[in-house]
């Protein structure tokens, strides 16, 4: 009959006996069956093929003949005892090497190996003197009984205190039948509490030890550490003390960059750029730190607080990770480089929403509905990302990594570029944490919606490098250079430092050139190393509008001025470098060199041989060579914009030069206009139809100015530019100055200027305009909120042909819902929403407060916006982007100026906020 494997481990029937009703301890020792599991099996020794009876007999024989060896049947004992350390278990002593009747704990390792080369097992029982088989059985049974009682007690009170465990130990030691062996604690749940005590009973012996042997058997003192420190675990109590000591000693050393980026707060008072940073010196700036900064900026509306918050982040970047300063600045400006590089993300809302849907596992329609409800694709992306959990999250995003990915997206071209862009965007969203997805989505859409204008970012940068000067060796010594100054002195000092950076940026509006110099030489020496030079486009000087000749005379009453034709064309800034290379830039610093190959070919013959380098400010105007007259602006817009072949040019252009900014290595921006004009005419030569000086008139006579204005209109010009010649006549880069005034024919009966507005919607026509658009909803651009705010409904100024043309061209821009950044408030919703990408020039009779339209709301009146009265379409501005449209601040300024003139308060004109 075949037997099961378990039957070999069951006690024989002869060994079993019925227990009496009352048993004595001795009877328990005599009658209790042997254990069910052998120690060999617990030690992973393969059972031999002998029967259980033979194996039991052999074990008994070994007990009688082996020194200090106990029986193997004690299943309960290992759960209570502390096992011997790993080093001792791996090298058990040979019975021949240990002296008789001596409980030795450590035997020489060479003798621990059997002749066959296998290590011998070793237990605590092998250290005991020889015993008889009867004593062994009695001790084993008694040990099992006590162990069972102790285990039961431990299960009832698993969290026994240290003192109670010590009492148990002392009580058992007094009985004289206990040998304590310090060893590694077991991992069984029952022994968790006991491992907290230092000396717990392990095994019992039936032999009384001599006094010397008892001393040897006592556990070593707590501080002695006789066992190997590598294999012996530290006691939990000691470990806790060590942790506390270590944390106390390292706390001061690890205060730099120890915060979680999710808790980073750059808006805190008394910010320390090193101790309050969330990364350490030499590490890359976490993108989450930038996102947290944007969050704090978004929470406040005060400009000074916004500048301070961004400045604190920049201080930490300067002190800890200077190479990341440039990416942080570009992402704060929502740019990828200087304008002349032409790097744009080119990610539409459709692609962005698809990427969010695929990265988060949500349905596209659900995301679109949520965007329509919340009006912010960034918040939708953040909420979608926060609901997804990943088993293996990607590494955290860094500012340099995100910036590099954005640049990769901008450089991708070709038929497969959209799929590649989608993959990059999805990868970014998958790696996002917390609010990172919000600002990734907003950056990709082109609108951060922080209210951080360029001047605010420059102010924050100037403040950062002033308080925490760059170039210091770490650890940074000066973290707050303004410490010790009074509040007023500190404010004035920071303003002076800010002016240094702003003036330098006006002449060199290229952070790629400014930041390396700033980090190496500091802000004070920045003007020495960053100077105006050909090849870097400048922001042009702009003019303020006026409403009549009388206003011009009042402003320039005591100074000499000149009147120049205002040509209707495109601003062209001509740069010629020392090596002869020619660059042509637009008013927005875009590189238009490829658009004008015909102009490049003319450069050698329009300058004198002595001229080696220069920067000219000109107007490129469409020119009819046959009729020798200026053509309308609309003709110029039909010219191809990129990669133009000179042989295919149909629309010819003529350059009208009106200013000289740089000549032969010398900047002329601080020279008066009279000197600049003189140098222009001395060093350049006119060529009819190709290069001509602007027509001008120097006079103070009212009648002459009026006649000159009429003549400019007859010569196909917009009007006049009136400029001071000597007093306050420097070239003010990137500034709309009162020293240059615009005087147009239309201004005499209007508000003083036309407005460039964005088309955001269209109304279906009725009557004779049925079947096409009859009206349009226009909006101004608000720089702070980065919104397009509705300002008026436009329906006049169009010919039938223009209406048909607009209807056809705008069909491709129809949207089911408005863009999130479009705000109309109480205005009548259009029949068709349009993608806000078209800019129109509009003229109006007047401006008025409006409870319906949101444009400039809060700037003039707390509750009302501003609208146009009798608006009229003038032309399409193909040279302008929506962000370059008339701003809400400009609308408010036009309204105030109109009110001042009506109330004859022209003296207050100087209070207008200038764009500096």
Curated annotation (Swiss-Prot):
Record's PROSITE patterns? DNA_LIGASE_A1, DNA_LIGASE_A2, DNA_LIGASE_A3
Which residues are involved in binding ATP?
564, 571, 619, 723, 742
GO terms for cellular component: nucleus
Q: Which residues carry this modification: N6-acetyllysine?
A: 144, 225
- Among its keywords, does the record have Heme? no
Q: Which reaction does it catalyse?
A: ATP + (deoxyribonucleotide)n-3'-hydroxyl + 5'-phospho-(deoxyribonucleotide)m = (deoxyribonucleotide)n+m + AMP + diphosphate
Query: Modified residue Phosphothreonine is at which positions?
Result: 77, 193, 232, 796
Q: Which region ranges are annotated with the description Interaction with target DNA?
A: 447-456, 640-642
Annotated Polar residues bias: 1-10, 99-111, 185-197, 883-908
**Cofactor(s) essential for the protein:** Mg(2+)
Region of interest (Disordered), ranges? 1-197, 236-266, 879-916
EC number(s) per entry:
6.5.1.1
Gene3D superfamilies referenced in this protein's UniProt entry, alphabetically: 3.30.1490.70, DNA ligase, ATP-dependent, N-terminal domain, DNA ligase/mRNA capping enzyme, Nucleic acid-binding proteins
- Protein's name according to its UniProt entry: DNA ligase 1
Q: Which organism is it from?
A: Mus musculus (Mouse)
């Amino acid at each position: 009959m075949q037997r099961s494997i378990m039957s070999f481990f069951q006690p024989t029937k002869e060994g079993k006996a019925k227990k009496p009703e009352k048993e004595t301890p001795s009877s328990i020792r005599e009658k209790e069956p042997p254990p069910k599991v052998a120690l060999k099996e617990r030690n992973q020794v393969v059972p031999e093929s002998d029967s259980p009876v033979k194996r039991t007999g052999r074990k008994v024989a070994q007990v009688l003949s082996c020194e200090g060896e106990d029986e193997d049947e004690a299943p309960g004992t290992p759960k209570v005892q502390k096992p011997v350390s790993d080093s001792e278990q791996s090298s058990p002593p040979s019975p021949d090497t240990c002296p008789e009747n001596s409980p030795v704990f450590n035997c020489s390792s060479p003798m621990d190996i059997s002749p066959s080369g296998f290590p011998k097992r070793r237990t605590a029982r092998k250290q005991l003197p020889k015993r008889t088989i009867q004593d062994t059985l009695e001790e084993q049974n008694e040990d099992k009984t006590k162990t069972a009682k102790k285990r039961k007690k431990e299960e009832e009170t698993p969290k026994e205190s240290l003192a109670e465990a010590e009492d148990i130990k002392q009580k058992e030691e007094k009985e004289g039948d206990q040998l304590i062996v310090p060893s590694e604690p077991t991992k069984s749940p029952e022994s968790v509490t006991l491992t907290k005590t230092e000396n717990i009973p392990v095994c019992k012996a039936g032999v009384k030890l001599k006094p010397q042997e008892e001393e040897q058997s006592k556990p070593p003192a707590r501080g002695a550490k006789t066992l190997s420190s590598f294999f012996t675990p530290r006691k939990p109590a000691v470990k806790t003390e060590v942790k506390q000591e270590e944390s106390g000693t390292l706390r001061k050393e690890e205060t730099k960059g120890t915060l979680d980026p999710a808790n980073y707060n750059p808006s805190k008072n008394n910010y320390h750029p090193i101790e309050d940073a969330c990364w350490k010196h030499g590490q890359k700036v976490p993108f989450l730190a930038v996102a947290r900064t944007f969050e704090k900026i978004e929470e406040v509306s005060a400009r000074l607080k916004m500048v301070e918050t961004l400045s604190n982040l920049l201080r930490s970047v300067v002190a800890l990770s200077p190479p990341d300063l440039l990416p942080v600045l570009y992402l704060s400006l929502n740019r990828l480089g200087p304008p002349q590089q032409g790097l744009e993300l080119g990610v539409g809302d459709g692609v962005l929403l698809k990427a969010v849907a695929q990265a988060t596992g949500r349905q596209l329609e659900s995301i679109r509905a949520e965007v329509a409800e919340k009006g912010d694709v960034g918040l939708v992306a953040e909420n979608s990302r926060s609901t997804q959990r990943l088993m293996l999250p990607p590494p955290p995003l860094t500012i340099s990594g995100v910036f590099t990915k954005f640049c990769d997206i901008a450089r991708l071209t070709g038929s497969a570029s959209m799929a590649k862009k989608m993959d990059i965007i999805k990868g970014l969203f998958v790696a996002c944490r917390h609010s990172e997805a919000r600002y990734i989505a907003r950056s990709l859409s082109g609108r951060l919606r922080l209210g951080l204008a360029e001047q605010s970012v420059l102010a924050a940068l100037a403040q950062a490098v002033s308080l925490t000067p760059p170039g210091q060796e770490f650890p940074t010594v000066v973290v707050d250079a303004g410490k010790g100054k009074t509040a007023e002195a500190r404010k004035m000092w920071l303003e002076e430092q800010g002016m240094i950076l702003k003036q330098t940026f006006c002449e060199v509006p290229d952070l790629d050139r400014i930041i390396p110099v700033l980090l190496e030489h500091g802000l004070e020496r920045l003007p020495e190393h960053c100077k105006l030079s050909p090849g870097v486009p400048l922001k042009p000087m702009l003019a303020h509008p006026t409403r009549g000749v009388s206003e011009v005379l009042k402003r320039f009453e005591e100074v000499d001025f000149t009147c120049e034709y205002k040509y209707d064309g495109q601003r062209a800034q001509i740069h010629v470098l020392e090596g002869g290379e020619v660059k042509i830039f637009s008013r927005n610093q875009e590189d238009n060199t490829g658009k004008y190959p015909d102009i490049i070919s003319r450069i050698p013959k329009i300058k004198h041989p002595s001229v080696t380098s220069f920067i000219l400010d000109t107007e490129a105007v469409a020119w009819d060579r046959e009729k020798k007259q200026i053509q309308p602006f609309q003709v110029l817009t039909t010219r191809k914009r990129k990669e133009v072949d000179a042989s295919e040019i149909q629309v010819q252009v003529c350059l009208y030069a009106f200013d000289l900014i740089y000549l032969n290595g010398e900047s002329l921006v601080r020279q008066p206009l009279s000197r600049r004009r003189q140098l222009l005419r001395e060093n350049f030569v006119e060529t009819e139809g190709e290069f001509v000086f602007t027509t001008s008139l120097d006079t103070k006579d009212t009648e002459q100015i009026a006649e000159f204005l009429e003549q400019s209109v007859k010569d196909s010009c917009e009007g006049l530019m009136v400029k001071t010649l000597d007093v306050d006549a420097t070239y003010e880069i990137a500034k709309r100055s009162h020293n240059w005034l615009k005087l147009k024919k239309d201004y005499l009966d209007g508000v003083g200027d036309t407005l460039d507005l964005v088309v955001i919607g269209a109304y279906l026509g009725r009557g004779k305009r049925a079947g096409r658009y009859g009206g349009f909803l226009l909006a101004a651009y608000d720089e702070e909120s980065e919104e397009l705010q509705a300002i008026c409904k436009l329906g006049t100024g169009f010919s039938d042909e223009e209406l048909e043309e607009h209807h056809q061209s705008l069909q491709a821009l129809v949207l089911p819902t408005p863009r999130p950044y479009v705000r109309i408030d109480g205005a009548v919703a259009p029949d068709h929403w349009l993608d806000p990408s078209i800019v129109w020039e509009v003229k109006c009779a007047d401006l008025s407060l409006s409870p319906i339209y949101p444009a400039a709301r809060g700037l003039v009146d707390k509750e009302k916006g501003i609208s146009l009265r009798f608006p009229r379409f003038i032309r399409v501005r193909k040279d302008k982007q929506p962000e370059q449209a008339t701003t809400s601040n400009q609308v408010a300024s036009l309204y105030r100026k109109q009110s001042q003139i009506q109330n004859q308060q022209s003296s207050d004109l100087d209070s207008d906020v200038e764009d500096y």
